[in-house]
Amino acid sequence: MGVGRSEGGRRGAALGVLLALGVALLAVGSASEYDYVSYQSDLGPYPGGRFYTKPHQCVAIPADLRLCHSVGYDKMVLPNLLDHETMAEVKHQASSWVPLLNKNCHMGTQVFLCSLFAPVCLDRPVYPCRWLCEAVRDSCEPVMQFFGFFWPEMLKCDQFPQDYVCIAMTTPNATEVSRPKGTTVCPPCDNEMKSEAIVEHLCASEFALKMTIKEVKKENGDKVIIPRKRKALKLGPIRKKNLKKLVLLLKNGADCPCHQLDNLGHHFLIMGRQVKTQHLLTAIYKWDKKNKEFKKFMKKVKAPDCPTFPSVFK
């Protein structure tokens, strides 16, 4: 991704989170003052609190938990704050958020998500601040809508605390938590030519096609892509007999640039998902067999190591 944050930037942001959290905990007393028989929440998101059937434990964040491995701390609590009791379940659920993290829609995205998926080890659960949730939601939901998704119910911001002990990056009005500037590229077109990133998109998409494009036009705020030739790499919900009639939409993309579409004389790798009767483009790459990273992807495409993505966005 051309505008992706560096790992150092993410770690710096996470350090700010931990410092803010430390100050907050000092304000209400040391962790040893809390007497919890089991891992219980009383912070409002889950009225009446909750108990887990298993005692909580502090475990290392594994390298293949890609959403949170670079968050800035090394250990997390299981069960987490989304009721995932095993690491396998955490990885399964968290994997669907990695493409959004790579879109860099807000610098607090990783901190917010990992405070829930991979909470830092403390004597009691601490949730993200409501304003952090709102800031991430307001910046990232417009990006999600390009892919046909909306902010999910499981992350409704009004369930998180406003002014109690909570995870924060800095003050709500700080300029550094605003959405990074400098890109107006349609999010599905803002892709890094790295084999791992292409595989992530393939796994997160319902279908994938090699195609040439006949025409691109604007209609009702979308870019409409009319294929000339197409070959299915992954059909998903598309029936083979319907391939000839397939039309793709770059949702909300009428007025944002998609540089891959500036020259239609190439073959393209196009991925997407079906929403009702529409087929939305979720990623586009020039089909470039001379590119080293694309060649790596082609070796992996026959048997990609894909998790089964949960329907967390519905």
Swiss-Prot record:
Lineage: superkingdom: Eukaryota
Pfam families membership: Fz, NTR
TM stretches of this protein: none
Gene Ontology molecular-function annotations: Wnt-protein binding
Location in or out of the cell: Secreted
NTR domain: residues covered: 186-306
SUPFAM superfamilies referenced in this protein's UniProt entry, alphabetically: Frizzled cysteine-rich domain, TIMP-like
Protein name from the UniProt record: Secreted frizzled-related protein 1
Organism field: Gallus gallus
Underlying gene: SFRP1
